[in-house]
Amino acid sequence: MQQIDIQEKKIDRALFQFVFPFSLKQGTESSISLFLNKSGFKLFQLNQLEDECAYYGDFKVSHRDMEAYYLSFTNKILFPHSEKEKGLHRYSKPLNIRGKLITDTECIPFQIHSVDLTTCPYELGFLTIRTELKPFTSVPLSHSLEFADRFRVLEPRTQKDNSTKIECDGKIYKGAGEFVFNNLFEGLSRFFEGDSKENSYFETFSFFEDERMYVQSLVALEKNEKIDVVDVYRMGSLCGLTVEGKPYVHANNLPYIQDYLQKHAYQRWAPSTYFLIEEHIFTCITIQDERTTPDLANQFYGEFYYGLVLNLFHKIVLLKLANTYTELNIEKDVKEMEKLIYSINSFTANYFSLEIVSQSRSRDIFYLLRKNFNIELLYKEAKQSLESLFRYQENVNAKKDSLLLLILTLYSVVGQMLGMGLVVNDFIGRIKWRNILAYNPVEYFALILAASGVIISLILGIQSLYQWIIDQRNRKKWVKQTVLSSTKE
């Protein structure tokens, strides 16, 4: 089949946010908050308007627009007023450092404006690296795609990955993973689930392909350029440069590309602006405009970023719940089953809603994200799992109650038939030991039956009290894991 002819385009600005989800070690929520404060991170809050220009390079992000975009229920989750409130707690740190991504054929300069760490319930977290290509001369679109494709790789797997190096502050790092965890987030990996990189905290979420970061991008082409469908497809698939340094696209069928865009692209403002959403990328490509580009950047860093993080949070939690359900041994893991029931209910009550966005503007983009992440399907499966667990728990409890009722009924009936009052009278006041020694076999049986009934009642009472205490402790632990992500319960 004939190769598609690629017409190289020049970019004016290229903004990237690389997002990496990770699993926190259990019980480290308080210590990671202290670590971040000591490392120069600051809790992000909407009422701190001075931060509107602090983390985004030349652009300003309106806190008022972010708050207005979401419903009040969602705002409480995304923008908690303090570390003690439930929700997603974002800690930001301005950097404004420059570096170079070096390949066998290219050297691509970039600037990192800031980094975020967001701690979440369910022992989750997100790293965000806010990056921009700021060339001194015009840079081809293929270079920005190659940069994103290589920078997102945290754990090299291929020859292409191993040939990538990053130069920053006079040091050369072997790939993005070493740069991220030995420079940008130095010392953070000790809070990750997994004791070492060999053990690897990267294995926590297997649905993220090859340990790569999610890419959110905004690319503005120069004013005299035009966007075609091949450019949009290359943005979504990160088709940058071949090993020879030439632009490429891994599709030769133009109707296939058009069909792909029908499924994954949002073309309301075409042909000047396209949005495209995939499982690994959320991208916008537009033509540079003095008015449009700042508005898109405001959304890119603001409501679109939080929409992405919220949907990633929903997806990961639902996948974790589904994974826990598949590994559950309901005959043995009774406590794990109760914890799973609580976790699903807590997620529904505290963090999930079908209506999240308050404004019709760009609402379609948010729900396109949900559709591509299969949020509704995952949530439906979680509810089905919950119903199945409830039915099983009801059956087990019904059997236990029936058995207990049978035992108590037998004691009551047999005791009345034997006339326990005859032996009980000998224990009122001073115990009549002579009478006890003179009992016949039937009276001894009645005595043993009465004594065992008292003992069983005491055991059941003590066991119930002990179980109540354990349940309260477990509940506090579950609340801390699923409702709060900070220091206090």
Indicate residue ranges for each PLM-predicted region:
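Membrane-associated alpha-helical segments
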Residues: 300-301, 306-429, 433
